């Protein structure tokens, strides 16, 4: 007898910020239960698929009872009897038939909510791996047609600014990437050591309260100069003895400080802001170039506003060989926007966030498209996370070569890194760590 889905149930749980989110249980005819939860972001791109929230006063408008109900009443009953290994069939059925809403960028999940559909999509994927009797990462690799499993380079977000932190820093994330490690295990060691050195450097310079952590486990010292953030990382890396082995990445999240006057305000968090730090896209581009000249920066994410395609293309053509230019808000993991960016040479790497697009199948499509264009791919958490570890397996199965899921601090972040340690151990001598090849760990599949 083929194993089929016997029930799909959802519930409201809480993410790492104390906001409601959706968890789904997929039960199979052999008694197996697959469970998955979805995350949510703070700095969200306007082109992301719809995250359905209840509004009203309960949970300050952030309840997800409608999304939960959509799983329990619409999606669940419709999936009973289906084969959990048919990921594409189930995803397309949910997205195109049960939901069916479309905007100019494709299937937008406005009826059922991307959070409802994704919770089920992730749980179905876990169920499919169980039925096949293989690890989740292997099942994902098979779904994508990828033959090479790769452990990603972790990008640890160790200094927080932007919408993630209460300091004056405009740029959202300052990350460290242990590209010189020989294994994921060693990368974790390097990351953790640099993190602790950074903590003592910050404590000494700014005092104990500067070592309080932000949503993703990074520090949020009250600094205003973005360059100061880079300087702190450079110092911590040197103190840990990893100069040349640990490099730097940034997530600017520039859409958060782009104004209607088409300028970028590096002082956007100041209450008595006189506009003295507003700069043009051209000036911001030159600022990045000066950073890259002075610091070992290998990756810059969302350097411009999500609609500022022109400056993206300029920056990519000027420094894209040396530095990865990552589209997050620009692309929102949407295959149609990825296609446009490839055509316009707007960036050269995809940030993969499953909850921006809302299904496993569409996520795989965006990754394959990016890899065929010669781009890099970085799998990513969201700032509001759960203990779910799906993205760890996803990054190995799709050989993304990179993952960012916070600092080596806070259990909802470590859950993913710890899962990657387990996967590396399970693969044994077969384990390959992306290392210096993080931008292109495998040939396109």
Swiss-Prot record:
GO cellular component: phosphopyruvate hydratase complex
One Pfam assignment: Enolase_C
Gene name, Swiss-Prot/TrEMBL: ENO1
SMART domains in alphabetical order: Enolase_C, Enolase_N
CDD domains: enolase
Annotated protein name in UniProt: Enolase 1
Enzyme class at the top of the EC tree: lyase
Annotated metabolic or biological route of this protein: Carbohydrate degradation; glycolysis; pyruvate from D-glyceraldehyde 3-phosphate: step 4/5
């Amino acid at each position: 007898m083929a194993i089929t889905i016997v029930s799909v149930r959802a519930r409201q749980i809480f993410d790492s910020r104390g906001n409601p989110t959706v968890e789904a249980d997929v039960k199979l005819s052999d008694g197996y239960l697959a469970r998955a939860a979805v995350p949510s972001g703070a700095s969200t791109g306007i082109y992301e698929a719809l995250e359905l929230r209840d509004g009203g006063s309960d949970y300050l408008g952030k309840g997800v009872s409608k999304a939960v109900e959509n799983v329990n009443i619409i999606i669940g009953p419709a999936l009973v009897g289906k084969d959990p290994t048919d990921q594409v069939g189930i995803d397309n059925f949910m997205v195109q038939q049960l939901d069916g809403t479309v905007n100019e960028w494709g299937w937008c999940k406005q009826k059922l909510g991307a959070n409802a559909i994704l919770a089920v999509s992730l749980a179905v994927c876990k169920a499919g791996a169980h039925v096949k009797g293989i690890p989740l990462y292997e099942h994902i690799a098979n779904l994508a047609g990828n033959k090479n499993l790769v452990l990603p380079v972790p990008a640890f977000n160790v200094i927080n600014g932007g919408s993630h932190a209460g300091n004056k820093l405009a740029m959202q994330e300052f990350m460290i990437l242990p590209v010189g490690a020989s294994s994921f295990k060693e990368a974790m060691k390097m990351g953790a050591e640099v993190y602790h050195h950074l903590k003592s450097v910050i404590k000494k310079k700014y005092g104990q309260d500067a070592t309080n952590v932000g949503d993703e486990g990074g520090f949020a010292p009250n600094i205003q100069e973005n360059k100061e953030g880079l300087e702190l990382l450079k110092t911590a890396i040197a103190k840990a003895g990893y100069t040349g082995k640990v490099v730097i990445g940034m997530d600017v999240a520039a859409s958060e400080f782009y104004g209607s006057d088409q300028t970028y305000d590096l002082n956007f968090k100041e209450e008595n802001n006189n506009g003295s730090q507003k700069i043009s896209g051209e000036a911001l581009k030159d600022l990045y170039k000066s950073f890259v000249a002075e610091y070992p920066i290998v990756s810059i994410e969302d350097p411009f506003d999500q609609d500022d395609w022109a400056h993206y293309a300029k920056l990519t053509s000027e420094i894209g060989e040396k530095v990865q230019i990552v589209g997050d808000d620009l692309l929102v993991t949407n295959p149609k926007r990825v296609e446009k960016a490839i055509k316009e040479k707007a960036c050269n790497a995809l940030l993969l966030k499953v909850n921006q697009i809302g299904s496993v199948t569409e996520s795989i499509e965006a990754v394959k498209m990016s890899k065929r264009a010669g781009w890099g791919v970085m799998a990513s958490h969201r700032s509001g996370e759960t203990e779910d570890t799906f993205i760890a397996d996803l990054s190995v199965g799709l050989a993304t070569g990179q993952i960012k899921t916070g600092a080596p601090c806070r259990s909802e972040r470590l859950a993913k890194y710890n899962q990657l340690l387990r996967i590396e151990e399970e693969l044994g001598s077969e384990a390959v760590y992306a290392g210096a090849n993080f931008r292109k760990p495998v040939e396109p599949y």
